[in-house]
Amino acid sequence: MTAEQLISFARGAPSLDIVDVEGLKAAAARAFDTDPAGMTAYGTSVGYVPLRKWIAGKHGVAPEQVIVTNGSLQADAFLFNHLVAAGDGVVVEKPTYDRTLLNLQNLGGKVHQVTTDAAGIDVDELRQLLESGLRPKLAHIIPNYQNPAGVTLSLERRRTLLQLAAEFGFMIFEDDPYADIRFRGEPLPSMLSMDTDNVVVHASSFTKTVCPGVRVGYLVGPAALIDAIAKKATNLYISPGMVSEAIVHQFCVSGAIDRSIATVSAALGERARVLADSIRRHIPGATFTEPDGGYFLWVDLPEDIDVDRLFPVAAKKGVAVVKGSDFLLDGGKHSLRLAFSAVTVDQIDEGVRRIAAAIDEVRA
């Protein structure tokens, strides 16, 4: 099986056909023409200043509340390193992004996973944990089209989560890189925009709406916290990548970002629908929540299918998936995360057929 023949539902990245390469070329040319000195210099740890101001305007905050970083994972790392010490309690969703688990565990944090359902994190379960004595430093939440579950946190639960954070004294880390990629329903307000108690730090990225290669993300939060992180960033790398950030800035101010979001959302909406239909047709025992946006669909397979056994069989049949157990401290043995962002529509049904064939072989 060659790389060209492999159908991969593994990587959460857009396929090249939905990346606005020409728009990026034009943005790069404008950036070099407009501000050659600014974009080729070291810059400051808060990021490329015009982009910082644009992000502040997008979120309705002061520029002092924004730091631009080398991708959202860098933003995550800055916040985790600033807030979490060995032994500190941290709440995350169950399931959650695998690198979140890894990074928090590497810091020595005591990670508590709280059940996630079709409406997001179970706030009643979280309240029970808090009332039992848990005092976390932060709760890491992916509110829109969550990675890996694909679900969206309901408006009611967003309100409750904000109330719990204020009542029990923890920060909400609203990790929101997928928010703009909605292809069904109406958008919900961010918890950042709803916050009246300074309990939210918001992160996002241009990886999903522009392209992964730009490596531009950001944090928005209380000015004092952002200033403290910026000082640490100065010692770490002086400044993030000014060239990438200047290109992203031109991509945004020209309106290309809006066209890119529309293109990506339309393409991924079609892929998500085709994937859901294919699963219903070829794996009738599977259950899942069809996402309203984002990159991912989480599938619970029948209990007689162990994904540790399925994974190598699927690989031999030319389809790559990610095991649900990668996103959990325990469990996930019968679940898969399927990323539909990098597969084209004409690959999806064949990919699901291969998964179904692998399931049949595991059962045989």
Protein language model features and the residues they cover:
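Active-site PLP attachment segment
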Residues: L192-A228, P240-V243
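Structural signature of PLP-dependent enzymes
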Residues: T40, I229-T234, S254-A276
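N-terminal "arm"/small-domain region of PLP-dependent enzymes with the aminotransferase-like
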Residues: M1-S45, G57, F170, K316-V319, ...
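PLP-dependent enzyme catalytic core of the Aspartate aminotransferase-like
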Residues: K316-K317, L329-A364
